[in-house]
């Protein structure tokens, strides 16, 4: 029954680019070819061949001879044998007796079904697809499509305007974020410097602890020396009182001897006793000389004891001054140690807080970047729905909150590098001051070595060594005191120092 050739169905010129250029736009068709057709409206098993053309949403059919004219002139006849509107039609494949590749076209307004048949499965599939696509073109769909196009155009213009505004704002905020990244890098570099300064602080604290222990030992030694001097002062005072008492007794004895000599001189002696008088007088004179010699010796001892007491008083006063000096230096070192410990703890807390803030900022920055990417994808997407619009609004709100928070914190974050730079400069100035103090300490070491120890006649070699140790401790304490005073002076006079944290405050 199938006598037609396999090329009875041909694609439309719109599907073939070479043929599309040769046709007028009004004559372009979607598909044409020869199909079998059963009569409409009456029950008949007879099939006849017809030339069919799909033009827009209409199916036109002619006699089979019209195909040759159409392929030659590329124009279709405007007087077809019949026209079937395809808008809203249901097209499906169907098997008929002797026609395995049949197609049924039905519509609620048709009084019957339109039955067509192709000669191969490929042709059937091709015609089914094109008929179904053409059936989608209706007046209602055209009106809806036009309204949708206008709505999408207006929405596209509004979204394009909003996109441009968002892009401008995002460019400004991106520049702000770049500036914040640079500030964060500067803060990280300064944190590294401060970490090195923290290590130096720990070394200074350790040195101060060692010096404090040494001062405690030297202070105990000074206290023992002072106690020995006080004991020596008591012994010298007792010796002086004893010598004074002895001198008074000798003075009384001398006075009595002189009185006896005066009485012997004034009293007349018998002639018989003249031979015995010289020995008695000589004895009194001898006793008087002995008393005078003894008094001179005691006076010399008394003067020596008074001299020793004076030296001991001077030594006691010097030791007392040294003890007070060591006590004040020990207290100063203790205060400095507490301040440095507090400053170290404060610096650690600030570093931890800075790391926490930086991690939070990086987290919020990642969230903002994710929201920005989502917003870009939503703006570039051609498909619009309510869910995507809600997501875009949420992304915009998130970005707005993030940038507003960045603007609020901009001033405070801008001041942080200046404060941290000032702290680094102060530490550098303190380091230079430490070197200067050490230089002056080396210069003053010669003056300490030239000093003579003030020792009394009872000072032993061990006490002399202790005095030398006390002088060395005094030198170290003097050096440390200047160091601490110089640091406090630099920190008090440096610009911006009031913004630095101080331990214990």
Swiss-Prot record:
InterPro entries: PH-like_dom_sf, PH_domain. Gene3D superfamilies: Pleckstrin-homology domain (PH domain)/Phosphotyrosine-binding domain (PTB). SUPFAM superfamilies: PH domain-like (SSF50729). Keywords: Coiled coil, Methylation. It holds the Pfam family PH. Residues 146-391 form a coiled coil. The keyword Coiled coil applies. CDD domains: PH_PLEKHD1 (cd13281). PROSITE patterns: PH_DOMAIN. The modification Omega-N-methylarginine is found at residue 502. Disulfide bonds: none annotated. Residues 28-136 form the PH domain. Residues 264-284 are annotated as: Disordered. Residues 267-278 have a biased composition (Polar residues). Belongs to the PLEKHD1 family. PANTHER family: PLECKSTRIN HOMOLOGY DOMAIN-CONTAINING FAMILY D MEMBER 1, SWAP-70 RECOMBINASE. This is Pleckstrin homology domain-containing family D member 1. It comes from Rattus norvegicus (Rat).
């Amino acid at each position: 029954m199938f006598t037609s050739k396999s090329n009875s169905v041909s694609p439309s010129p719109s599907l073939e680019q070479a043929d599309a250029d040769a046709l007028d736009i009004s004559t372009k068709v979607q598909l044409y070819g020869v199909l079998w057709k059963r009569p409409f409206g009456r029950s008949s098993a007879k099939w006849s061949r017809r030339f069919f053309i799909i033009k827009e949403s209409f199916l036109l059919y002619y006699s089979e001879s019209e195909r040759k004219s159409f392929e030659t002139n590329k124009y279709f006849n405007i007087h077809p044998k019949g026209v079937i509107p395809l808008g809203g039609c249901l097209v499906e494949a169907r098997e008929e007796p002797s026609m395995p590749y049949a197609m049924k076209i039905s519509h609620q307004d048709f009084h019957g079904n339109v039955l067509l048949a192709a000669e191969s499965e490929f042709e059937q599939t091709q015609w089914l697809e094109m008929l179904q696509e053409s059936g989608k073109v209706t007046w209602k769909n055209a009106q809806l499509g036009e309204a949708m196009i206008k709505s999408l155009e207006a929405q596209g213009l509004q979204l394009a305007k909003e996109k441009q505004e968002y892009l401008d704002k995002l460019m400004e905020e991106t520049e702000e974020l770049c500036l914040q990244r640079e500030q964060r890098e500067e803060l990280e570099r300064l944190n590294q410097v401060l970490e090195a300064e923290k290590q130096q602080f720990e070394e200074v604290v350790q040195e101060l602890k060692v010096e404090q222990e040494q001062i405690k030992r030297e202070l105990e030694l000074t206290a023992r020396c002072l106690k020995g001097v006080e004991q020596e002062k008591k012994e010298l005072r007792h010796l002086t009182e004893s010598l004074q008492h002895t001198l008074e007794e000798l003075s009384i004895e001398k006075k009595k001897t002189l009185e006896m000599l005066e009485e012997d001189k004034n009293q007349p002696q018998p002639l018989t006793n003249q031979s015995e008088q010289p020995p008695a007088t000589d004895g009194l004179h001898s006793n008087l000389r002995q008393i005078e010699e003894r008094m001179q010796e005691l006076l010399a001892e008394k003067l020596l004891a008074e001299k020793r007491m004076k030296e001991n008083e001077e030594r006691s006063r010097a030791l007392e001054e040294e003890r007070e000096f060591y006590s004040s230096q020990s207290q100063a070192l203790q205060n400095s140690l507490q301040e440095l410990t507090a400053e170290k703890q404060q610096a650690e807390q600030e570093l931890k807080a800075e790391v926490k803030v930086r991690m939070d900022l990086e987290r919020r920055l990642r969230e903002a970047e994710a929201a920005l990417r989502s917003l870009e994808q939503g703006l570039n997407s051609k498909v619009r729905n309510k869910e995507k619009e809600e997501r875009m609004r949420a992304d915009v709100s998130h970005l707005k909150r993030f940038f507003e928070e960045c603007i609020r914190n901009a001033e405070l974050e801008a001041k942080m590098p200046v404060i941290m730079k000032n702290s680094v400069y102060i530490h550098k100035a303190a380091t230079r001051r430490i070197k200067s103090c050490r230089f002056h300490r080396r210069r003053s070491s010669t003056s300490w070595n030239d000093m003579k120890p003030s020792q009394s006649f009872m000072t032993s070699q061990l006490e002399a060594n202790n005095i030398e140790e006390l002088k060395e401790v005094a030198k170290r304490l003097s050096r440390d005191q200047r160091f601490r005073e110089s640091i406090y002076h630099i920190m008090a006079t440096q610009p911006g120092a009031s913004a630095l944290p101080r331990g214990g405050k």
